[in-house]
Amino acid sequence: MMKLFVRFYLLAAILMIQAGCGSKAPTPIVPDPPQQEHQEQDETNKAEDTMPSEIKITVSGKSLPVKIEDNDATRALVAALREASITYEAHDYGGFEKVGGLGRSLPSSDSQITTQPGDVILYSGNQIVLFYGSNAWSYTRIGRMQYGTLDELKDFLQSGRGNITVTLSL
C-alpha cells in the first residue's frame, strides 16, 4: 500500500511540474525608442502649438505682414491657415474698407472698436474687413497690416477700384 501512495505522489508531482512548464514563448522585451525621437516629436508639436506673431495678406501678387492679436478668432484662423491658405473676394464698402466673406465662421468676441487704417477685423464671425480708413463698430480684432504710408496701403488694397482677390497665409 505504501508503494501505491509513493507512486501516486510521484505521478501527481510530475503532472504539477509539467503543468507549470507550458510551451508558451516568453514575451519579448521591446526597448523604448531613443529619447531623441520623443524630443523631435515634442518640438514638432510645440512648433504647431506656437501661435505665430504674423500672418500674410496677398493682393495682386504683393504681400503685407499682419501682426496678429492673440484671441480665439486668430487661433482658429491660424489653425485653418496651417491646413491651407484662404482666398476670398473683397469689395469696397463705405469708402473706408474692403470686406469679404471667408466662407467659414470663426469664433468672435466683439467689442466696440474705432478702427484705424491697416486694421484687419472680423465682422459677423465670417467676414474679414481690411481698413484703409476709420470706423467705429462692434468687431473682433484680428490684427494690423504692417505698411508704409497711407497712400501705399490704399494702393495695396486698390481702394475705390472695385473687387480684389485676397489671400491669407502663414
Language-model features: where?
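Glycine-rich active-site loops that engage anionic ligands at enzyme catalytic sites
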Residues: 85-170
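Bacterial N-terminal signal peptides that target proteins for export
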Residues: 1-9
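C-terminal motif of bacterial Sec signal peptides marking the signal peptidase cleavage site
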Residues: 17-20
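Hydrophobic helical h-region of N-terminal Sec-dependent signal peptides
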Residues: 10-15
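Extracytoplasmic
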Residues: 50-52, 61-63, 72, 116, ...
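N-terminal low-complexity, Pro/Thr/Ser-rich intrinsically disordered segments
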Residues: 30-62
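N-terminal secretory signal peptides
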Residues: 52-95
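Bacterial signal peptide processing site
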Residues: 22-24
